[in-house]
Amino acid sequence: DQDIYGQRLGFDGTSIVLEWETIEDNNGDGIDDFPNGGIPIATAVGNQSSQKVTYYSEEYSVIVWQDERYGSSPDIFATFLDEDGTPAEAYPIDGLPIVSSHDIDGVQQYSDLYQHKKPRVKANADGAFIIWNDFFRPDASGNIYIQKITHENNGVWDISSELIFDGIAVSEEYGEQSNSRLTLDGNGGVYVVWENSENEQKDIKIKHLDSDGNSTFDSDGLSICSADKDQVSPLVRKDGNGGAF
């Protein structure tokens, strides 16, 4: 199994200090096997990987990851930790699903398992926005989905999915959408950019969603560059005035 651990770093005026302590004695010999090893964040069965973390508020940070606790087809999970490393009240140990092919008890919802991969997260005190690559749709080539969560709710935006835990589509165009990035707009919304693979060529597209998950652009986003050959590796940053670079 591959698990996720975390450590909070502080500064005492002269040096970096480790704020979180845990004792892990796997051998029963009274000796800490991982001194200064941080605290467990996700240690469920299976692999937990592709983790991302960001500041949420003065009270919490938010962590998201790719989770295979229900098998080799990964889901996306998240948790909120306070300054002591304690999860928010609404989030149990090992987090809650953001998108999953299973219900809260781990019961598979479909005969086929679908993959949800490579989460990313940006946040402010109003909520955290999580994007991921989603392989639930019919062409299975990979689309981009998003969900807004808070320390009290692991799915703020309403969904029309057959899944219990899911998000809303950023893009469901034919072909693959990948290598997505996001940034906050400063007004409660979010910008998302990605590589759009269509007609054997990669272009760059962008989409803006407001705080309620409504798109202010075309349903599948706006084209940033569709010149001949491939355009790859997009990045996006807010401009401080509600727009983005």
Question: Each predicted region: which residue ranges?
Answer:
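Extracellular, repeat-based ectodomains that mediate carbohydrate processing or recognition
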Residues: 1-245
